[in-house]
Amino acid sequence: MSDHYAVVGNPIAHSKSPQIHTRFAAEVGADLHYHRLWAPEDHFAPVAEAFFAGGGHGLNVTVPFKGAAYTFADTLSDRARAAGAVNTLRAEPDGRHFGDNTDGIGLLRDLQTNHGIDLAGRRLLLLGAGGAARGVLHDLLGEDPRTVVIANRTVDRAEALAGNDHRIRACGFDVLAGERFEVVINTTAAGLQGEMPPLPDDLLAPGATAYDLVYADEDTPFMAWARARGAVTVCDGLGMLVEQAAESFYQWRGTYPQTAPVIEALRIGA
């Protein structure tokens, strides 16, 4: 009998997770079934409980339920605790549920392994201060960047995310003029509406990397902006999606799948 996994969200029909995990399973020879699971916005816990009570082994969690999954989990990884959100739930032998957040490690693996970008000693700018930014900040700080700046339209939110961490400076977009960054990561969802944060034209240092957590068939406005201003490496978030899924797969199965073939297949729409 196949092991049972799912991704839960609302909406959920667009999710690529079933394709990704089905490819991982074929690669490692795992017998599993993975499907999409829709839940009403205020009913995450009952849906998750029913899934696990029915023999489910693990859940991926996407918007808007990462906070609810954090509350649902009985035990948490350090990175989930730092993010205040969970995107991976695992059923434990004693009936409890372990919660992890694989977004940050997924971003790091895409940057480092797939694009050869080392964050150590780099000047890093994080655009946005919402859940996506919080989900990756812990792992980014662990790479010892030289400077970390969080810029957001609402400065209070950036300051709240920075907290008392002396390694981080919080500010609005309007005070970035005259600064240069070697790595700029856009965590806002502006690209989904064909928009981007208001940024000065001279923001990118020579040889800069620009990374948008949004993924699409074409360049997002932020990616197009970065290319036009000389960024050497410009990436969307598809690689991060696959890499965070691989970490979830490892949490469930104890085997780490190859990711490059899956990223390539998704790029060409296979």
Curated annotation (Swiss-Prot):
One of its GO terms (biological process) is chorismate biosynthetic process. Pathway: Metabolic intermediate biosynthesis; chorismate biosynthesis; chorismate from D-erythrose 4-phosphate and phosphoenolpyruvate: step 4/7. One of its GO terms (molecular function) is shikimate 3-dehydrogenase (NADP+) activity. It catalyses: shikimate + NADP(+) = 3-dehydroshikimate + NADPH + H(+). Transmembrane segments: none annotated. NADP(+) binds at residues 78, 128-132, 152-157, 213, 237. Keywords: Amino-acid biosynthesis, Aromatic amino acid biosynthesis, NADP, Oxidoreductase. One of its GO terms (cellular component) is cytosol. Shikimate binds at residues 15-17, 62, 87, 103, 215. It is an enzyme of class 1 (oxidoreductase). Belongs to the shikimate dehydrogenase family. This is Shikimate dehydrogenase (NADP(+)). The lineage of its organism: Bacteria, Pseudomonadati, Pseudomonadota, Gammaproteobacteria, Chromatiales.
